[in-house]
């Protein structure tokens, strides 16, 4: 049966993959840097993204820029919140009773860390909740947070990662895995 087909671990066709990822007009030699979302998130996905982008950056001798997934989600919130600047609390379910949490101050073209990404409990987020700030992420589904919830949709676009990475380049920020 097709359900039980063997999984193969064949080497991917990198040329085909790169051709699908990059439009024909983009040439790898034209890149100034490579950015990727460095978590928190699925370990396997993060490891794959880091390895793939590190290989490109190393071979082209260009900077590799890690961007926090939580920071990218916060940046994405500007699609829904038009009143700038604002503070947004990003909180996603991690595992067991833990949550991934960070807070950011957003303006039209910059994002500052208010609270570094960390693991917290539900009790913690109930204590820090403020009716003035905005919320994004799947850990805010409790009714008491509903009035300030931007979205519980847990995602971000490559555009958010690129925008943040571009701001780092403009600021000539040094790049580290801790973003």
Give residue spans per PLM region.
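Residues at secondary-structure transition points
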Residues: 8-12, 43, 47, 51, ...
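Oxyanion-binding and handling regions
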Residues: 9, 65-179
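Short, charge-rich binding segments
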Residues: 26-27, 58, 80-81
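DPxDG-like acidic metal-binding loop motif
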Residues: 33-69
């Amino acid at each position: 049966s097709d359900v039980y087909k063997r999984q193969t671990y064949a080497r991917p066709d990198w040329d085909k993959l790169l051709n699908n990822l990059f439009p024909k007009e983009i040439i790898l030699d034209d890149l100034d840097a490579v950015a990727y979302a460095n978590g928190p998130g699925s370990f396997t996905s993060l490891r794959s993204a880091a390895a793939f982008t590190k290989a490109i950056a190393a071979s082209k001798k260009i900077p590799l820029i890690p961007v926090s997934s939580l920071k990218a989600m916060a940046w994405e919130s500007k699609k829904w919140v038009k009143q700038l600047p604002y503070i947004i609390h990003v909180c996603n379910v991690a595992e067991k009773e833990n949550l991934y949490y960070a807070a950011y101050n957003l303006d039209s073209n910059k994002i500052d860390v208010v609270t570094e990404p960390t693991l917290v409990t539900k009790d913690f987020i109930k204590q820090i909740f403020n009716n003035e700030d905005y919320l994004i992420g799947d850990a805010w589904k409790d009714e008491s947070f509903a009035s300030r919830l931007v979205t519980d949709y847990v995602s971000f676009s490559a555009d958010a990662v690129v925008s943040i990475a571009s701001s780092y380049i403009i600021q000539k920020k040094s790049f580290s895995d801790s973003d």
